[in-house]
């Protein structure tokens, strides 16, 4: 009972960029073909685009090597970012006080499916 696997997934955890900023990039590539998604990411002027590109590249490699899927027929079926743990830091302020700084992290997941 060998099931036909038509999708592959890749996840990057603890990426030092907020999930809110990553979602803006992921919304641009969701539903697109892999070639089109790489072209969009290459010209997206956002810092998170390089992190998303790495995850997409990994998902495509997983599809090709682990499941023997054809790269030309792959589509970004799912792309989402969840919040990771927040690193809490403090910025010194006037009169001996301090203000909190939240350095947010995210978990980026990309799923590619054969069309």
Swiss-Prot record:
The organism of origin for this protein: Limosilactobacillus reuteri (strain DSM 20016)
Name of the molecule in the record: Large ribosomal subunit protein uL22
Recorded family membership: Belongs to the universal ribosomal protein uL22 family.
Keywords: Ribonucleoprotein, Ribosomal protein, RNA-binding, rRNA-binding
Keyword Phosphoprotein: no
InterPro entries cross-referenced by the UniProt entry: Ribosomal_uL22 (IPR001063), Ribosomal_uL22_bac/chlpt-type (IPR005727), Ribosomal_uL22_bac/org-type (IPR047867), Ribosomal_uL22_CS (IPR018260), Ribosomal_uL22_sf (IPR036394)
Superkingdom of origin: Bacteria
Function: This protein binds specifically to 23S rRNA; its binding is stimulated by other ribosomal proteins, e.g. L4, L17, and L20. It is important during the early stages of 50S assembly. It makes multiple contacts with different domains of the 23S rRNA in the assembled 50S subunit and ribosome. The globular domain of the protein is located near the polypeptide exit tunnel on the outside of the subunit, while an extended beta-hairpin is found that lines the wall of the exit tunnel in the center of the 70S ribosome.
GO cellular component terms given for this protein: cytosolic large ribosomal subunit
The keyword Membrane belongs to this UniProt entry's keyword annotation: no
Matches recorded under PROSITE patterns: RIBOSOMAL_L22
Molecular function terms, GO-annotated: rRNA binding; structural constituent of ribosome
GO biological process: translation
Subunit field text: Part of the 50S ribosomal subunit.
């Amino acid at each position: 009972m060998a099931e036909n696997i038509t999708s592959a997934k890749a996840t990057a955890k603890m990426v030092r960029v907020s999930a809110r900023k990553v979602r803006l990039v992921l919304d641009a590539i969701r539903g697109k073909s892999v070639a089109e998604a790489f072209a969009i990411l290459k010209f997206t002027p956002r810092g998170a685009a390089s992190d998303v590109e790495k995850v997409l590249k990994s998902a495509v490699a997983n599809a090709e090597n682990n499941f023997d899927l054809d790269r030309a027929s792959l589509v970004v079926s799912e792309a989402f970012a969840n919040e990771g743990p927040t690193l809490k830091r403090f910025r010194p302020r006037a009169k001996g006080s301090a203000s909190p700084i939240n350095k947010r992290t995210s978990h980026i997941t990309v799923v590619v499916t054969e069309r």
